[in-house]
Amino acid sequence: IRLSLVGSEMCIRDRYKEGEKIAIKVNLNDNGGSNIIDATPQSVYALLHQLVDIMNVPQHCITVYDAQRRGISAIYTYLQPVYPDVVYQNWGGFVPDVIRYSSEITDPGAMSLARAAYEADYMINMALMKRHSRPTDNWKDSAGQTGITATGKNQFGSIGNVPPLHLSIRDWSKFRGMGTYNSIVDLMAHERLGGNTLVYIVDAMYVNPIHNGRAVRFKRAPFNDGWTSSFLASNDQVAIESVVLDFIRSEMPVAANADNFMHEAANIGNPPSGIRYEGRAQKSLGVHEHWNNPDDRMYSRNLKTGKGIELYRVPLDAERPAIEYFYSDRISKIEDQPVTLYWKTSNGEEVLLNGEVVAANGSCVVKPETSLMYELAVKKGGTVQAVQKLVVRSFTDVRCYDVKEAQTEGSAIVEAEGFAEFRGEKGSSKGALTWQIGVPATGEYYLLFSYSGGSQVPSYLYLNDQLVSENI
């Protein structure tokens, strides 16, 4: 993935001053339990590469967060070794009494804002592309949610208590249709959220048909029954929502009021609902319109009939040097266990692994004595055109305990039926959380427990090099 924020790069360079904080709001809806609908690590890596390595933003000034979810491991495991000083934050950490809603919502938790957003000088909204709910008359079938999730709904992950907002975004067809209040508009207009955002990015590498579903292929051109494999980027939050909706609606039905909040936001000074929004002084939060048809995908600026949206497809040079993949078969080396690196590149004149020339496609076994970063670079015309980094962690101080000793320490209990139970003091309303992990009855196990951050979040539990759980 080569993510270059052309216009936004200029914007950041012109405005950014050393020491200012940047918050990156990602979507980690799956809580780290699987990779069904989480932000893709490669996409966040590409963004951090731009900010840190190209724009020279200090790592400690960047926070990647989703304050409503516990799934930060979806990206932490891959990115923290490469960018260790970036702050990776998930559940918790809210500032009270920050957000005012224009109608219906008075819950104190809903008025609290994630500290990462509150303290940031700039926001980058990095959302996913997905239909949130199927059209239905039964709110239970739709999980009581909105039509699509993109940059607007993404900010629900910045709010302390989300359920009070759900009523205003639901489509019960006959209950709440067009021209009604929508709390997403209040978030889009808020000075610490929409008002503080440099760029809106939609990670459309994959598209999901429902809030907890698996990715689906798109049938129409240019996807041609393939993965969407795309990014959308804009400085206009209403425009990017409009385009996301058009793409999704061209492949699957959406809720009847899916674009209600877009109409409200585009006309926030005089919305169809008649609601006096808190941000009404802004008159409009952006441009809302729909394309002419799903085959040509032309908006008013494309058609030269108005000054609305222009959908511009950034051309990619098919001959550009690229890293197709670069990964290791395990994230850490324990004692003498070998680790294998794999890579595939294209269109380069020279490929370097930590400065040494290697084949364009290949693999190698490494046994670093200490944790070590590996950098794969592809050169053409004497300059590096593509680069990717990964870190292999090395653990040599491995201590062995039998079951009885482990039970005495209280760190693990291996039960007769082959379950390992780990307990922590963080996670549930009662202050305790229990995991049960199926393990073979015999064998050798390595337990890696790591902790990061100034509070109890996040912490991670690994069993045999596999993430077991987090937030202990």
Segments the model singles out, each with a brief description of its role:
Residues R2, S8-S34, D38-A318:
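Extended, low-polarity segments enriched in aliphatic/aromatic residues
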Residues E319-S328:
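Proline-enriched interdomain boundary motifs that mark the N-terminal boundary
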Residues R330-Q337:
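Short, solvent-exposed loop/linker segments at the N-terminal edge
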Residues G355-A360, G427:
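Short beta-strand segments within Ig-like beta-sandwich modules, predominantly Fibronectin type-III
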Residues V358-Y374:
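Solvent-exposed segments in extracellular or luminal domains encompassing
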Residues T383-R393:
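Edge beta-strands of extracellular beta-sandwich domains
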Residues F395-I472:
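Extracytoplasmic
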